[in-house]
Amino acid sequence: MLNQLKQSLRLNLVLTLVCLSLFLTACTNKITTKPEYIYPPQAYTAPCVKTAFTGETYGDVVIQLVKVTAERDKCASQVDHLNKWINQAKGGK
């Protein structure tokens, strides 16, 4: 008899807790999240210039080397600025 009473009380307790949890979840507001897209400044995403070699002499090769080096430095600068911008955006959140 005592065993049946304990089982009955446990069953009632479980049912009560289940009902309470269902009632509590019904009272919450629905949370919606809106993604925020942050894009880097357009100056940092400009495509890099790739000058084709059209020379015929060793002098033309030297001139081309100067051009290619300048282009490479500009692209490296864009990448550096982009990395700085990413780090600032992460720190701002």
From Swiss-Prot:
Membrane topology of this protein: Single-pass membrane protein
A GO cellular component annotated for this chain's UniProt record is: membrane
**Keywords per UniProt:** Membrane, Transmembrane, Transmembrane helix
Q: Subcellular location, in the record's words? A: Membrane
Instruction: Report the Pfam families cross-referenced here.
Output: LysC (PF23793)
Q: List residues traversing the bilayer.
A: 11-27
> What protein does this entry describe?
Uncharacterized protein HI_1413
